[in-house]
Amino acid sequence: MSVLLCCQALSLSLFAQQQKVDTAHIYSIPEIIVSDPYQTREVRSASPLQVFNKEELKNLQALQVSDAVKHFAGVTVKDYGGIGGLKTVSIRSLGAQHTAVSYDGITVSDCQTGQVDIGRFSLNNVDRLSLNNGQSDNIFQPARFFASAGILNIQTLTPHFKEDKPTNIAAEFKTGSWGLVNPSLFLEQQLNKKWSMTANGEWMSSDGHYPFTLRYGNDADVQVSKEKRRNTDVENLRTEISAFANLSDKEQWRLKAYYYQSSRGLPNATTLYYDFSRQNLRDKNTFIQSQYKKEFSRKWVFQTSAKWNWSYQNYQDPDALTSVGGTDNSYYQQEYYLSAS
C-alpha cells in the first residue's frame, strides 16, 4: 500500500513540473484607489504663510480687518486712538513701512503718511485674509511686493449663484458700547452666464465717550474723579461696486470701484482736568482697479493689473496757537498704476 502511494505522488509531481505557464497572459485585478488629504496652501508654501478663510473670520467676532490681523502670529498691530484711530500692521518689528497691503492682488498705498490704515477695511465682504512672512509664492504679484518684508493680502468675495437664484442679498446691523451703530448691505446679481456684479456698503458711527478714572495728587491726598473721553467721535462710510466676467474657463476679468470717507475727532491729553479739544481729521479715498488674466496653455499665462487712486486728507485744529488763528491743512494724492506679467 505504501509503495502505491509513493508512486502516485511521484507521478503527480512530475506532471506539475512538465506543465507550462503562459507568461504572456493578461490577468485583470480589481481597481485600487489611493487617496490622501489635499495639503493646504499653508503647508505647500515655501515661506511662512497664515490664512483665515471666511468661516474662520466669522468665528473671530472681529469688526474690522485690523481686529482679525491681531490673531496672526508674529504680527504687531499698532492702534493709535481706539475705534477711530490709525491702525497699522508690522511684521518682524520692521515697521509698517516694510509691510505691504494688497487688496484683491493690487497694492494699497498712502504717500501722505507712508503707512496704510487697515482699520478702514471691513470684514463684511472679505473672503480670505492671508499674511506672508517674506515673499509670496505667487509669481503674478506686483513688483512693489518684492521690496517688502511681508504682505497682508485681503481677498474680497467672488459671487456664487444657484441655478434658480440669480440674486443674493444680505443685510447686517451691529451695535455696541459707546454709541456704536454699524449697518451694512451686500448685493450679488448674475447678469448672464458670463457676467455678474456685486455692490456693498456700510456706515459706522460711534461717539467713543468711554469712561476712565482720573487721579491727581500723592498717595496720602489723592483726588479721584470719574470722567469720559471727549472729542472721540468717528463716522465712516464705505461703498464698493465690482464687475466679474468669466469669458471662458481660461479667461477672467474683474473691475472694482471703491469709495471711503471718514470724519474723526482727535482727543487731547487730560492736563489738570482740562480735556477740551476740537481737533478733527477728515479722509476721503476712491480708486478704480482692474485685473485681466488669460491662460494660453499650461506653460503660458498672461495677467495685467491697472489702478487709479485718489485720496484727500484734511486736518483742523481751531485752537492751535498760530499767526493765522488755527490750523487747517489739506493733502492730496493721485496715483496711476499699471502692471503686466
List where the protein language model places each region:
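Periplasmic-side early beta-strands and strand-to-turn transitions of outer-membrane beta-barrels
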Residues: 153, 178, 186, 190-279
